[in-house]
Amino acid sequence: CNLECKYCGYGEFYSNYDRRETGDQAFENVKLLVDYLTKLWCSDYNVSHKNEITIGFYGGEPLLNMKLVKETIAYIESLNLPSLIFNYNTTTNAMLLDRYMDYLVEKNFSILISLDGNEVQSAYRVDKHGNSSFSRVVRNVKKLQETYPDYFEKKVNFNSVLHNLNSVAECYYSIKELFGKNPRMAQLNTTGLIPERVEEFSKM
């Protein structure tokens, strides 16, 4: 990931602490999985009346590995499976959204953007040097909204994490004011907290 959010479920408060620097997933692994699943998708096990398949790209930050995303989709398209409808989605911090938005729009991705409200409410969402990510994220998301307004209206949503710097009402009104959207909301993850850090974490 290119951020180091203070409350990250893989962060310093958790027993499964992982700096998320273990490298990118390899296309060879994805190809094996797609080949295996294709046999199931094209078999009697697939009882979906629409034959729709949704593939999600999640991280870490998936836009850091756009090479893999593009390779995966190109491979799926090369399989020539006209009986199946493929949909794609991703959850992103939007730090690299300006670089890749044209491709995401071309492939009609559903995008879930992580943002906790305004700049104060999003203060836990910092980069590796402790700097706020807010201005860059808003700039990138605004660029997407202005360049592809219809797509933005239909395919882009927001997820806000609730903590001591915001509230349900504050998240709602901030995202609504910034982008005209109603955000989804999630609570802080309390699973796997290091016992010695619970009291400190509880103040967030």
Where are these regions (language model features)?
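Radical SAM enzyme [4Fe-4S]-AdoMet core and its adjacent flexible, acidic
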Residues: 125-138, 142, 146-204
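Hydrophobic faces of well-ordered beta-strands that scaffold small-molecule active sites
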Residues: 53-55, 88-90, 111-113, 154-160, ...
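Conserved alpha-helical substructure of the radical SAM core
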Residues: 3-99
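A short acidic, amphipathic alpha-helical/loop segment
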Residues: 71, 99-103, 170-174
